């Protein structure tokens, strides 16, 4: 079983991580994309990022300092958003960390597909960024089928916990033979079931943690997840989409 999640905008660096960083999969592509970013003016970068002046200054400095020769922080420790706080990789057991390293993958606009412990440097480049980049219409076109091919090379079941922005880098290439299950976390609001972004991020992180602590997780293991008051709803689910509803 593999799990895929989205990255986070918030990032930190750790010079003494719990695990040794592993090599990234696409160094040539990262170099090409970063060369494009380095060629842009601060104003052009801010337009690409669609962020505040403060965030633009911080990330322009990151672009200028970016050098793949530097040792990066393992990805699951480098991202610091709600999902990653809920996952809590820093307080997993040794076996949990080992399982995480074997099963968790993170989709990234800059790095493409990351293993949990792949060493990365702070950056800002969302998969859904608007406009041409590195000779492509957008990042979806730039990465093409490469991320799908890397993810499904072993034929494993893939549990999709990524946002639509990121899973869209994979879904156009899925075939009927691929084993792919999307997990949705919903709650009732004004008489309707909706997926609230912050709550869903927290639940995704909790599910990743829960599965990392299982030695041989199956689809039945996923259905048994109840952290945070969520329950699997068979009546709302299909073979390709598991729906959980908060009590």
Curated annotation (Swiss-Prot):
Signal peptide boundaries: none
GO biological process: response to hydroperoxide
GO cellular component: cytosol
UniProt xrefs under InterPro entries: YaaA
Family indicated by similarity: Belongs to the UPF0246 family.
Superkingdom of this protein's organism: Bacteria
NCBIfam families on file: PRK02101.1-4
Source organism per UniProt: Limosilactobacillus fermentum (strain NBRC 3956 / LMG 18251) (Lactobacillus fermentum)
UniProt protein name: UPF0246 protein LAF_1150
């Amino acid at each position: 079983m593999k799990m895929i999640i989205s990255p986070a905008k918030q990032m930190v660096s750790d010079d003494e991580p719990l695990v040794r960083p592993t090599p990234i999969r696409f160094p040539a592509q990262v170099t090409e994309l970063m060369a494009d970013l380095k060629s842009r003016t601060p104003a052009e970068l801010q337009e690409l990022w669609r962020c505040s002046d403060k965030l633009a200054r911080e990330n322009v400095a990151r672009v200028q300092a970016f050098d793949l020769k530097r040792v990066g922080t393992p990805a699951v420790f480098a991202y610091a958003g709600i999902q990653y706080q809920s996952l809590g990789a820093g307080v997993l057991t040794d076996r949990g960390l080992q399982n995480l390293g074997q099963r968790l993958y993170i989709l990234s606009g800059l790095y493409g597909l990351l293993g949990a412990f792949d060493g990365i440097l702070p950056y800002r480049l969302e998969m859904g960024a608007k406009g041409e980049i590195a000779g492509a219409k957008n990042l979806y076109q730039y990465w093409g089928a490469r991320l799908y091919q890397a993810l499904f090379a072993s034929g494993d079941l893939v549990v999709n916990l990524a946002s639509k922005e990121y899973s869209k880098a994979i879904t156009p290439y899925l075939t009927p033979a691929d084993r792919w299950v999307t997990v949705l976390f919903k709650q009732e609001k004004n008489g309707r079931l909706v997926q609230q972004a912050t709550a869903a991020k927290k639940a995704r992180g909790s599910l990743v943690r829960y599965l990392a602590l299982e030695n041989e997780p199956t689809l039945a293991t996923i259905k048994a997840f109840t952290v945070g008051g969520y329950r699997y709803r068979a009546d709302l689910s299909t073979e390709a989409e598991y729906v959980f509803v908060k009590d």
